[in-house]
């Protein structure tokens, strides 16, 4: 009986439901741009994390390997087509094509978007972002804060 109770408790702890919805390719290509995609929210100023930012108006993107106050960066060029990112890594001259997917998620807080880069040329493959980051008039952020 004790084993059965422990098993049920363990299964309950492991089966948290995470709400998510895959975003179609066209919307994903728009959501990819002009926002920070962060591996995880740092808990201390010395936590190590990775960040992508895809900024076509500046001619490419940046990958950061950092803490809050210190880090390194790498500039790259990119194109998107369907569900792919085509990276042109300027330092190494490597060209990498990777499938990507964006999902709407409910956390981890404060995130509501999840980016997965299948063959990530630099980082951990999974990053989180916020729709409100590019919310020009603040309505999405306001709605999120009222939850």
Label each region the model flagged:
Residues 1-7:
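Sec-dependent signal peptide recognition
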Residues 5, 31, 55-57:
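A short, polar/charged loop/turn motif at coil->beta-strand junctions and beta-hairpin connectors
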Residues 18-28, 51, 86-147:
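Beta-sheet ligand-binding and adhesion/scaffold domains
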Residues 20-48, 76-80:
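Tryptophan-anchored aromatic micro-motifs
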Residues 37-42, 62-67, 87-91, 115-117:
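Short beta-strand segments that buttress and anchor functional surface loops
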Residues 43-84:
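N-terminal glycine/threonine-rich, aromatic-flanked beta-hairpin/loop signature
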């Amino acid at each position: 009986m004790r084993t059965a109770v422990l098993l049920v408790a363990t299964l309950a702890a492991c089966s948290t439901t995470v709400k998510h919805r895959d975003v179609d390719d066209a919307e994903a290509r728009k959501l990819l741009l002009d926002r920070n995609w962060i591996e995880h929210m740092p808990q201390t100023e010395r936590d190590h994390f990775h960040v992508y930012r895809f900024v076509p108006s500046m001619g490419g993107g940046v990958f950061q390997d950092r803490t809050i106050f210190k880090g390194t960066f790498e500039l790259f060029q990119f194109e998107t087509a369907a569900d792919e990112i085509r990276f042109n890594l300027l330092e190494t001259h490597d060209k990498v094509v990777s499938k990507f997917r964006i999902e709407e998620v409910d956390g981890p807080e404060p995130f509501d978007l999840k980016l997965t880069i299948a063959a990530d040329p630099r980082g951990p493959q999974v990053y989180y972002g916020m729709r409100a980051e590019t919310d020009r008039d603040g309505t999405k952020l306001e709605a999120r804060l009222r939850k």
